[in-house]
Swiss-Prot record:
CDD domains registered for this protein in UniProt: AdoMet_MTases
Catalytic activity entry: demethylphylloquinol + S-adenosyl-L-methionine = phylloquinol + S-adenosyl-L-homocysteine + H(+)
Function recorded in the entry: Methyltransferase required for the conversion of 2-phytyl-1,4-beta-naphthoquinol to phylloquinol.
InterPro entries named among the record's database cross-references: MenG, SAM-dependent_MTases_sf, UbiE/COQ5_MeTrFase, UbiE/COQ5_MeTrFase_CS
Encoding gene, per UniProt annotation: menG
UniProtKB keywords: Methyltransferase, S-adenosyl-L-methionine, Transferase
Protein name: 2-phytyl-1,4-naphtoquinone methyltransferase
GO biological process: methylation; phylloquinone biosynthetic process
EC number: 2.1.1.329
Organism expressing this protein natively: Synechocystis sp. (strain ATCC 27184 / PCC 6803 / Kazusa)
Listed Gene3D superfamilies: Vaccinia Virus protein VP39
Family that this chain belongs to: Belongs to the class I-like SAM-binding methyltransferase superfamily. MenG/UbiE family.
Pathway: Cofactor biosynthesis; phylloquinone biosynthesis
Disulphides: none
């Protein structure tokens, strides 16, 4: 993998990266988040505003952890649709669904976050976990989320955040470079995870994400820093 690919990967190369890391994806997510990602994902589901019986869309669903959190809330009368561009991660999600959550109505689709295969005004809520940073066009991804939501409904988008505090920012950079990447080396995935810091450097700040959301048609948008500012959740209402 070239240095240029690490700093500005194409969507095809990002898809290939996730295909390669799929077998270790859950373990590395737990390590990346200090074991807290399940809590943050539950917070995102709560901020999405869904309730029992609702239809929830989880975009960039990966191995399904955020979708499963949503399925527990919407229950057997509702439905969760998980969409991702990586077939390998979707297979893991489907396997977990079958073994642990078979009683909950869920559907897994391979698709593009920039061209969602759904009708306008179809969902009661939407979530996205650690996906917005990896799409090729953030405003277009937000446009599609706004389109498929019913009027008055919300999307909650969890991702890394660039801390305003210099100490937290330095810790985040040190942790990625000196803990996460060396751990990934154990699975021979050093280059795959080395793209994390460049992707974070390119990722819009919370206020910029809010601006994008409002520009594409959301009526309201707020960005909440969490985990000492190391993570953030963008909540936008149609």
């Amino acid at each position: 993998m070239s240095n240029s690919l690490l700093t500005q990967p194409t969507q095809e190369s990002v898809q290939q990266i996730f295909a390669r890391i799929a077998p270790q994806y859950d373990d590395l997510n737990t390590f990346l988040s200090f074991g807290q990602h399940h809590i943050w994902k539950a917070m995102a589901v709560k901020w999405s505003g869904v309730s029992p019986g609702d239809r929830l869309l989880d975009v960039c669903c990966g191995s399904g952890d955020l979708a499963f959190q949503g399925a527990k809330v919407v229950g057997t009368r509702g439905k969760v649709v998980g969409l991702d561009f990586c077939a390998e991660l979707l297979a893991i999600a489907a396997g977990k669904h079958k073994s642990k959550y078979a009683h909950l109505p869920m559907q897994w689709l391979q698709g593009d976050a920039l061209a969602l295969p759904f009708s306008d005004n179809e969902f009661d809520g939407a979530t996205m976990g650690y996906g917005l940073r990896n799409v090729g066009n953030i405003p277009q991804a937000l446009t599609e989320l706004q389109r498929v939501l019913k009027p008055g409904k919300k999307v909650a988008i969890l991702d890394f955040h660039q801390p305003g505090n210099a100490l937290a920012a330095n810790f985040q950079r040190w942790y990625l470079a000196n803990v996460v990447v060396p751990m990934a080396k154990q699975w021979r995935l050093t280059e795959e995870y080395a793209y994390l810091q460049p992707s974070l450097d390119r990722f819009p700040t919370g206020p910029k994400q809010v601006q994008f959301a409002l520009e594409v048609g959301f009526a309201k948008a707020v960005h909440y820093p969490i985990a000492a500012g190391l993570m953030g959740v963008l909540v936008a209402e149609k």
